[in-house]
Amino acid sequence: MVMADGPRHLQRGPVRVGFYDIEGTLGKGNFAVVKLGRHRITKTEVAIKIIDKSQLDAVNLEKIYREVQIMKMLDHPHIIKLYQVMETKSMLYLVTEYAKNGEIFDYLANHGRLNESEARRKFWQILSAVDYCHGRKIVHRDLKAENLLLDNNMNIKIADFSFGNFFKSGELLATWRGSPPYAAPEVFEGQQYEGPQLDIWSMGVVLYVLVCGALPFDGPTLPILRQRVLEGRFRIPYFMSEDCEHLIRRMLVLDPSKRLTIAQIKEHKWMLIEVPVQRPVLYPQEQENEPSIGEFNEQVLRLMHSLGIDQQKTIESLQNKSYNHFAAIYFLLVERLKSHRSSFPVEQRLDGRQRRPSAIAEQTVAKAQTVGLPVTMHSPNMRLLRSALLPQASNVEAFSFPASGCQAETAFMEEECVDTPKVNGCLLDPVPPVLVRKGCQSLPSNMMETSIDEGLETEGEAEEDPAHAFEAFQSTRSGQRRHTLSEVTNQLVVMPGAGKIFSMNDSPSLDSVDSEYDMGSVQRDLNFLEDNPSLKDIMLANQPSPRKTSPFISLRPTNPAMQALSSQKREVHNRSPVSFREGRRASDTSLTQGIVAFRQHLQNLARTKGILELNKVQLLYEQIGPEADPNLAPAAPQLQDHASSCPQEEVSQQQESVSTLPASVHPQLSPRQSLETQYLQHRLQKPSLLSKAQNTCQLYCKEPPRSLEQQLQEHRLQQKRLFLQKQSQLQAYFNQMQIAESSYPQPSQQLPLPRQETPPPSQQAPPFSLTQPLSPVLEPSSEQMQYSPFLSQYQEMQLQPLPSTSSPRAAPLPTQLQQQQPPPPPPPPPPRQPGAAPAPLQFSYQTCELPSAAPPAPDYPTPCQYPVDGAQQSDLTGPDCPRSPGLQEAPSSYDPLALSELPGLFDCEMLDAVDPQHNGYVLAN
């Protein structure tokens, strides 16, 4: 049986599973599919997870049954409720609660981060649900934004207990599973762990995601992500309060024993700022022992009895926890009653156990059945009717299974495969009237959002295509159901003939600087409606002022921080308001002014898949070895790999112009490295990522291939290092030259001589000495340069003497110094006797006798840059300065010293980095 191609108002979906009409597909997986169903009796929407047991092995089948066992034990307002379990020979049907507003992942991707007040309310709900699970010795092990759903009142519902397990206090678990960005470090290391501590870490990541709109630990590959998690360092944005930062840091502790417990989290200062009101229990929670008849909701039992459902069988089903049709109808009716009562203020609610049975309520229920009025138990303050847009609803392929499951496909479509009891009546569709409430509080808790891929557990690899969703929307425009795609607020836009209502938001918070995105629940379905000209014409025609055009068409509230930007840039930043640019925290030591802190927006990331045996990457690390991991290499080779295409000037230019770049240009920032280092790495990260994409084994620690340019840089760097270790002859030559040039003796200066000499007490020390080895920038070249002998600004140089020779004019330099290859070590100079006259020196210029009363040397405050050739000019980063007058008035008897292969001296240090425009070095004065 397949779905008919006729209009939906002629045939309401012929596909049925038990009492449920299948209305659409929420998600698909390899062995399961999640369908949107509606109960024929209660008219309640449910999510039906249909599992093909024939495609599962024993291990996965056991995991499915354990998930069912766990969900049967859980009954919490912030956990997805299990209504019914139906099983045939080859199929398993899990009927669960349906969260209309989808994943909080999608909400954050569309609306950006939450303010701390809203994040605190959400986190209290998550904390209460996890505490409830831990109290029943159940650990979730896969808490993430994709598994946190939002109901019609924007309350949290935890879903997907497929990775859940039971634990005992003091006993460790040994199975490693979870989602990598949310997994604790002990899971990556393959250690045994305690279940509650694992959930505490995941909740810390979730809280960070709620407040920041980005992941604290992220990486392009699993090994990089693993390394960042094991380091445990993450970035704290400027807008995060100190109390929130303290709480997150105490939860994301590498040592599991030092993490906060749930009781400590509840008592934390940040959590106590706003404590939620404890709502009374609408119906009693099932205890471990069998409940008595009086503990069930008598009002629901009477309503079921009026529908012709045997009350005794219902009670037996509830006591036996059979989760059959009787229990499902009971649970669904209880949920409708809860939805009805939740519309009233908390102070006016009473516990069901404290109330006497109301005859007026019973008469109201009876009138609802006799007169035929709908029993409207939905919240009257609902500001939005959920859209009935069902993606893939009219396609036959929406019910497709794997090729081997074709027989099972027809099995779950036949109603006869599931036994259903006979029911005399049913409730009518709970469609409340459209309410235009001007006094509603503009809070996300009153808002709803229609999502294309809403659902319980989206197991498909890809999301729904917006183009397909638009086709589905166009195909359902003629249906009889009302589609409300936006908030029902002050101004309505009615599409004639279609029965659909669009709304224009007239909230002043769109223009308020203090707005924290309270109005940020605009439907994602309208993203593809922007291309519909008829919709735009209708909306523009119904608007009294053009001021409302921009917020509605752009579908994003105005970011107050981006008021000064142009409309194009404002649209980019409003999509995810975590693109903060100013205001630094003292605890965030790695932030640099002018660099945007986050670029890994949730809207740019794919959903995180849960992974079994997450510690396999640890085994690969042990097999391959740490040398294959580029992140484990020392800092110098890492920068050699990543920094060869980014000069230092370009970094400064990028920092100056970063505020004018669009959001997509900035690199993703590592929480563990300085921004300059990260920027240098990002320049070569793109080609390495392309190579990783071509080779799938790059995912596991394999080093990306180096280019020839990178290998040449490393080779040249190694040659330079060897050359610097063997330049004693060059230092000796400079030492001899400085001794001969002591033409401006200063009696007040007594500077040390080179270590090789032991001068007599009467000998005057030369005013120049080299106290540190030559700069690594020195490298022989094939050209000559002019060298000025005035070096009075370098008064701390210490040079070594050359071997004595009898020639007054020597050859310029030994030939081995003119070669690129490292020279052999020179012979040591002969020792000098104390008191002996200094040997004749080798100079390439004539010596001269100086007058006895020489004027003192002029003071040179700043070093001057000597004229060099083009190749060496790039090596010099000292500032240019004009030659001082004292140099211009020097005696003309000095010939300029022409040294081959000799660049200028610099009192500088070399940063251990590679720069192609500076011949492989980045110099700092």
Swiss-Prot record:
Comp. bias intervals (Polar residues): 765-774
Catalytic reaction equation(s): L-seryl-[protein] + ATP = O-phospho-L-seryl-[protein] + ADP + H(+); L-threonyl-[protein] + ATP = O-phospho-L-threonyl-[protein] + ADP + H(+)
GO-annotated biological processes: intracellular signal transduction; microtubule cytoskeleton organization; protein autophosphorylation; protein phosphorylation; regulation of insulin receptor signaling pathway
MF-aspect GO terms: ATP binding; magnesium ion binding; protein serine kinase activity; protein serine/threonine kinase activity
Positions annotated to bind ATP: 26-34, 49
Entry-linked SMART domains: S_TKc
Subcellular location: Cytoplasm; Endoplasmic reticulum membrane
Name assigned to this protein: Serine/threonine-protein kinase SIK2
Source organism of this protein record: Pongo abelii (Sumatran orangutan)
Gene name linked to the record: SIK2
